[in-house]
Amino acid sequence: MPLLDRVREYVVRHGMLEPGDRVIVAVSGGPDSLALTHVLYRLAPAWRLSLHLFHLDHGLRGEASRADAAFVADLARELSLPLTTVTLRPGELEAMRGSLEDNARRRRYAEMARLAAAIGAQRAATGHNRNDQAETVLMRLLRGSGSTGLAGIPPVRREGGLTIIRPLLGASRQEILAYCRAHGLTPRMDATNLQGDFERNRIRLEILPALTERFGDAVVDNLAQTADLLREEDRLLAELTREACARCGWRETGEATGEPVVELDGTLLVQEPLALARRIVRMAVQRVSGSAYGPGLSAVTRALELAGRTEGSHWLDLPQGVRLSVAYGRCRFARSHPQLGPGAEALEQVWPVAVPGETAIPALGVTVAAELVPPSAMPARLPDDEMWLDRDRLPGPLAVRTRRPGDRLWPAGMQGSKKLQDILVDAKVPRDQRDGLPLLVAGDTVVWVPGVIRDRRFRPDAGTRSAVRVTVRRRPEGSGGD
């Protein structure tokens, strides 16, 4: 089926467009966005569409980024379409919290939402294709995602007040490249897409080709089909979850203060089928945090273990700056706030650190940001609030806790190890502050005491293949959420 007909059929099947819609088209200059623009331009007269091109110049590739912007400007002039280009300052994405990929994505959608509000657009179209879908499913499978994650990229979704549509999601990358050749379209090629620095690129360049070579060309279609099937089943699970929420006495409050709170009966929650109970916890965290992403399996499991307690009062800090409080079987999910100092329970807790991602730890008054970075980018001198680690040398997953008896580190300039207690005394850390210090650990090994000492064994060197940059920031008193 010709690409134009395939896109037309896909758009109709998923209800992506209405006659007379004003549509923002995200254009990078690559083959996907170029084909998307060309196809929508051809479909526009029949549906009376008003197209408005959008380009985000990330400023990450110097002259190549400027050439991309100029290419898109030429395309807009050739098609007589309006264009909005947003140019970011050098280092702007790197300064944001989270990974570079996630930051670029969030900024792109935020800018498109602003543009939509300014021009009255109803939709924004992006060039995601069937290969992107397969890569997403594979990436999330390797991360251990559930059905929601494995449902992949949705054809239509609401994001930040804007409806995002993906008209090319039913087409393969090969079809798109063939379309560009057939219509004399010469796209820009982003060299970073050919580098193995990012997780998705490794899947695109190494893992998926190896699977295709071993199991045939149907691998991409089969992975994308899996996403389609799971998306339908996920819709059913979502409906069953809403019914289970009602059975558990789900109640939302706090809208007037801008700090949403979810309350429910924990004794009823733990009686639900495990699949539904997990989804209820994830939904509660998403409602309170406002994030599209829920907590991982480990955090959800700990939340359910706590929710079933019927004696006394307990609490647990979850990702996205949400705290679960349980009092005699009643659960309350709310924004977490820093305390004046950690209590006895906080001193016994361990907070897993999301990599990449950001973890708020109100009990210790800190926020921990972690991202994967190229080892070669490490500066000669690190700020006091920053730590770089050789990912392959870490003895376990990263987490934050307070000190424990027997903690030791290997300081720079010393042959062996030294007790943390002695290190804190030598550093003149006040006695009343020592128990509340946040420690970055890998497994049960202390790798960093922010502002005090770093363990030399995990510092990246010439042989490092993958590095993690961790930043610890103090949270202003009274702040909440993320």
UniProtKB/Swiss-Prot annotation:
Pfam families: ATP_bind_3, TilS_C
Taxonomy, superkingdom: Bacteria
Residues that bind ATP: 28-33
Main localization (coarse): cytoplasm
Entry's Gene Ontology BP terms: tRNA modification
Compartmental location: Cytoplasm
InterPro entries per record: Lysidine-tRNA-synth_C, Rossmann-like_a/b/a_fold, TilS/TtcA_N, tRNA_Ile_lys_synt, tRNA_Ile_lys_synt_N
Catalytic reaction(s) noted: cytidine(34) in tRNA(Ile2) + L-lysine + ATP = lysidine(34) in tRNA(Ile2) + AMP + diphosphate + H(+)
GO molecular function, one term: ATP binding
Domain notes from UniProt: The N-terminal region contains the highly conserved SGGXDS motif, predicted to be a P-loop motif involved in ATP binding.
Family: Belongs to the tRNA(Ile)-lysidine synthase family.
Function comment: Ligates lysine onto the cytidine present at position 34 of the AUA codon-specific tRNA(Ile) that contains the anticodon CAU, in an ATP-dependent manner. Cytidine is converted to lysidine, thus changing the amino acid specificity of the tRNA from methionine to isoleucine.
Name of this chain's protein: tRNA(Ile)-lysidine synthase
Source organism: Symbiobacterium thermophilum (strain DSM 24528 / JCM 14929 / IAM 14863 / T)
Lineage: Bacteria, Bacillati, Bacillota, Clostridia, Eubacteriales
